[in-house]
UniProtKB/Swiss-Prot annotation:
Its main location: cytoplasm. This is Cilia-and flagella-associated protein 96. Keywords: Cytoplasm, Cytoskeleton. InterPro entries: CFAP96. It holds the Pfam family CFAP96-like. Belongs to the CFAP96 family.
Amino acid sequence: MPEGKTDMERIGLFSEMGYTSIGDKYAAPGSKPFNESASKNRQMLPGGSKSMANMLGGYFDGQFKRVFEGESYSDPFKQRRQHRMQQSKKNLGKPFLPSSGEKKRSGLGSFYGTLGGPVVAFSAELKSRKAYTAPGKNFYTNPPKDGSGYGYPSVTIGKPYPYSSENYDISRELIKKEIEHHKSKLKGGAFKLNLHPKDYFEPNPYYTDKTLPPLKVHSQKKETEKPFKPSSPAKEAGGMKAGTFDPYPTHSNDPYTAKPSKTPVKERKVFHPPGGPKTYPVHSILTSNVIKSVTALNYKTVNLASY
């Protein structure tokens, strides 16, 4: 028998069960089939049962009416008629009629109540008149004018201007003649130099025609390779130590607390915490009692005690 706990003891399945139970027998984990719904009944499950919509598309009423349990049906048309009948009972007699008849209106255009009545001179009726005949024209004592002068020849004081023709492109022809006269005086074509054109000033501002002096020969110094030495000695870790008598404060021999003596590891034993109870998935007592008592055959007639 090896030392220590076995795997079954570490898992905790063989530990002592709780005393609160309903008397069920132990069922091994492998005794029940895994994913039983994948191999039985219908495999393809389409959409579930249809539920009633919340809209008024399939109802006869235009709006929801309240319906309570035990409430009688109420017809709005019947209630409206009953209300009118109750209001008509409040009438004491016939409708009120004034003692005198309807009075004639007395206002603009009405002569009711006046002493003289309507005036004939202010009547709106049209009077009969003779047909209108237009008067004749006056006698002409002077012949008509030939015009105001605009567009009429030989009417104004001065004589009209004689017509003179003018060429439309006279300016173009004059320029052409000047160009031909200029070309006739030229002796030859334009002078063309077969060299690359240069600027008047040199583009290089440092260019000079003078000869440069000879280069100075610098004597090379002999360099002696010496190891590099810093100007100050190396600093120790922990900050600046310059200006102190000691490089680091010495440890005080008077201890603040007594240090415990450490024993070697070989003499001490390794601490092992005690093993507590292992957790595993279990059903509650109430759930287990319901699963055991209620089945597919007696779920309609079973009567469980409730506390």
